Every structure is written in structure tokens, then in C-alpha cells.
């Protein structure tokens, strides 16, 4: 599992409305670990993909760019953080393949 971040700078209230609209179009079952963090100056999405190659493919895809454009989100600052060693919730470990 590979973790990356998407940083959107701007009015967090506006960005969150747009993010919620975009996320409504994504299949929830496709999200391995997905977190949206409100900041004073924007939002940051923490997201995982099965591999670094999958993260790069998704984050640079025309489909992702189209999803951003459809709801008026700006191009984010994308950071490929690295491979996840452990992910845990109160329900227990998150499977990492």
C-alpha cells in the first residue's frame, strides 16, 4: 500500500464543498485508506493506492484531472509519501498488501 497526499490551498469551506461533490462520484469500495483534513488555509487529502505505480498513474490521469475540473477544484500539490508499513484503526489493522 502506497500513501500520498493532495494539498489544495484556498478557502477550506469552499474546497470542502467541492471535495464532497467529487468524492460522491468515486466508488467507496475503491478507497483503501482515505482521510480529508481541514487546514486554516485549505484542505489536504491523505490517500492510499495499492502501489506507487498505481498512485502515480491515478494522480496524473486525465480521469482524476476531469474529476477535479468537474467540481472546480484546483490542481493540487501532489506528494508521493512512500509505502505504508502499518495502518491501524480501533477495529484493528488495515490490511496492507
Give, region by region, the residue ranges found by the protein language model.
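Cytochrome P450 catalytic domain signature, combining two hallmark sequence patches
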Residues: 65-67
